[in-house]
Amino acid sequence: MSITHDYDVIAAEVHRKAMQNITDEMAITLVRTSGSPIVTESKDFSTCLMNTVPEHLGFSSYVLFHVGSSLIGTQVIAKEASVATDLQPGDGWIVNDPHSAGAMHQGDVSVIMPTFYEGEHIGWSFANMHVLDVGGVGISGYAPGAHDVWQEGMLFPPVRIIREGAIDSEWEKYIAANVRAPGPVLNDIRSMIASNNTAQKKLTNVINEFGLDSHREYCEINMDLSEQVLRERIEKIPDGTYEAVDWNEFDGHEGPDQLLELRLKLEVDGSDLRYHYSGVPQIDAFVNSTMGPMFGQAMTGLMTVLINGDLPVNGGLWRPIDVEIGPPGTIVNAVPPAPVSNAHSEVGMRACKLSKDVLCQALALSDDPVLRGRIAGQHQDGFPGNALFGNNQHGGVSVVFYPDNAIGAGGGAQTIMDGLDAYGLTCTTGGGIPDIENHEGADPVLFLWRRLIPNSGGPGQMRGGQALDQAYAVHYSDMMAGPGFNACAQVPPHGVGGGYPANAGIFYPVRNGNIQELLDKGLLPTYERFEGEKEDVRSKLGHIKLDHDTVFVALSGGGGGLGDPLLRDPEAVARDVAFEYTTPDHASSVYGVIVTDDHEVDEAATTAKREEIRATRIGGTPSAELKAPVNIGVSLTHDSGTWSCGSCSEELATGGGNWRDGAKLSEAPIAERYAEMGMQVRDRVEAPRVVMREHFCPSCAMSLGVDVVTDDLETLKAPEVGTPVAAAAS
C-alpha cells in the first residue's frame, strides 16, 4: 500500500536498521556458539524477527529460502499459541517437519520463540540451521534410499520442548538417543536458543528507546515502503503470462533414471505477481517438495531478481505475491508418506530456477533499462555431495557433510559482467566454503585438490561462472559410508538471451589409488600426480562406502551464459585461455576466437572462424551483419505483437506468435553437443533424451535462445504479453 500520512523519515530508517541489526546479531550469536562448521563457515543458517501476525520485520539473508520456512513454521506455531493460556517468556518450539510446518527438509531444524515486552506478547523470533544429523537411514538429513518420510529421521511438527530458555531434559535424552552426533546436535539447538535470547534482549532495548506504539507504527511503515517500491517495479513489467518447464532428475532407487517434470506459469497483472506451480504425481523418493520449500524457493528467485540488495526484506514484500502449488499429491505439493529429505535441493531448487526463468523472460520485455539489466543466466542450483559417518582419527566418530560443492557452483552471467566463480546456490547469499584445514582437523580426511574447472561456465557474450572441482580421501580411517546425491547431472542450467548452458555436476569415487605411494616419496597427491580406478556411479546413492584412501571427487556445475558467444570480446576470451578458465579448443569451437601460444588474439583467423560458425549455424552465408544487440536475444514490439531479432531486427513472428517458429533451429542430444564443446554433462541414454535446441536468426545468425529440454517436449512457448487470463475473467 502507499503511505498517505506524514512520518519521520529518519526515525523510520533508524528503526528499520535496528530490526535488521537484531537479526544480524542473532546470526552472530549462532556463529559464536554453534561450533559446527556448517554454521561457522558454510553459513547454512538464517535468523529473523516477526510480529504477531506473523510478518517479517527483519531477515538475516544468509540462506534466502528460509523466508518460506520461517513464515510457514511461525504461522503454525502462532495458531497453536493463539489458543494456549500458558505462553511464557523462554518458551520455544522445535520444528523440522516439511509436511506439517513448512521446514525446508528435516536436516534444517528451527527454534522459534515468542518475544515479549513488559509481559505482553509482541511477536516471534526464529533461528534455523542445518544440524549435523537427525537420525534415520540417511546421514545429516539426506536419505536417497528412503521410501517414506518415517525412514528419513526424526520429525518435529512444532513441539514446545523449551521452557524457561532451556531444553526439557527428557527431550534432550530422546534427541541424543536418535542422532549419530548427539553432542554437536544438542549444542546447535542450544545455540539457536541463545540466538533467540539475543533477539529478545535487543528488541527490548529498541522498544525502550522508541516506545511500543512507535515501534509498531514504524514496523508498519517500513513494510508499507517495501511493498510500495516492489509494486512500482512490478508495474514496469509487461502484463502477461510467462511459462517455464524444468525436470528433477532420478528418484534414487533401482530402475531407470527418471525425469520428473514440473512447470511454472507466472501471471503479471498490474502490481501483482501470481505463481502457479504444477508437477507430476509425488513419488516414493526424497525429492518431493512441500509448501515451505516451494514458497521459499519461489521467493528466492524473486528476491535475487527484483529485491535482494536494495530492498529491505520484510513482510511488505510478500503482499503483491501469490504462490499456488496446485492439488495435494504432486512433487510440488507432496503429502505423507512421501519422503522429503531433499525437498529444498531437488524439486525446491528447480522451483527457484523456474521462478528466475519466468521473471527474466518478463524483465527482458520491460521498457525500463534498469529492469532489463537485471536478467541473468541460470545459476547451477544443484550440487554433487555426500554425507558420511564413521570413526575419526581422534578416537570418536565423525558425521561428514561438506556443503563445499554447493558453495562451489558457478553463478549465472549478468548483463554487466561474467558470472561469479564458485558463486554457490541462488539461496546461499551469505554462504562460504570452509577451510580445508578445518575439515582435516576434525575428520579423517585428506584433501587432494580444490580447483576451478575449465570450460564449466556457460558460453556467452558474458560467460557463466566457473565451478569447483574438489577431491578428498578417507585417509585416517579404515572406512566411512553414507548417501550420495546430485540434483543436476543430466539437465544443466541454461543461459539467457542466446547464452549457452553450463557444465552439469558429477561425482565419483576413485579406488585403489596411489596416495600412500606418493606420500612415501614425499610428494603430494595432486591432480596431476594422482592415479586410480574411477568408478561410475549413479546420481543418487542410498549408500556409498569409501574405504581407506578411496577418493571422493565432486565436480560442481557452472552458471549459464548471457548473449551470443560470438559477441564476446576476443580479448576476454584470450584472458580466459591464459588463466586456464577456457581451453584453446573451446575458445575456437564455441567463441570463434583463435588464441596464439603466447595468449594473443589472431584477429584474421578469429574473423574467419566466426564467419565459419555463423554460416554453419544457418546453413549458408548470413545476409545481415552480426552486431551487439539493442536487446539481448529477441525484441518485442508490444503494440503489434511482433517478435524480431535483437541485433538485425529480422522479423520472426507477428500477431503474438512464437518467435522460435521464425528462427533457424538446430537440435542435438546435449551430451553430443557438450562433447563437441569440451563441456561436462551426464549422458542420458533412457527415453526421453535431453537435447539442446539452438535458435538462430535466419539473417544475421545471432544466437537468439538455447533451450535445454527433453526430446519429446513441444516447442517452448513465447510469453503471452497482455492482460492475464485470470484478470480478464474477473
Which residues fall in each region the model found?
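Short, structured motif recognition centered on aromatic/hydrophobic residues
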Residues: 642-659, 692-696, 704
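Glycine-rich phosphate-binding loop of nucleotide-binding enzymes
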Residues: 92
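Short recognition patches in nucleic-acid-associated and regulatory proteins
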Residues: 650-690, 709-711, 716-717
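Short, flexible, mixed-charge glycine/proline-rich loop motifs
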Residues: 628-644, 684-691
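Short, compact, well-ordered microdomains
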Residues: 688-725
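Short linear recognition/processing motifs and adjacent strand/loop elements at protein termini
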Residues: 637, 679-688, 724-729
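Sequence context of c-type cytochrome heme-c attachment sites
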Residues: 33, 626-635, 664-668, 675, ...
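Glycine/proline-enriched, intrinsically flexible loops and inter-domain linkers
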Residues: 1-89, 97-117, 121-622
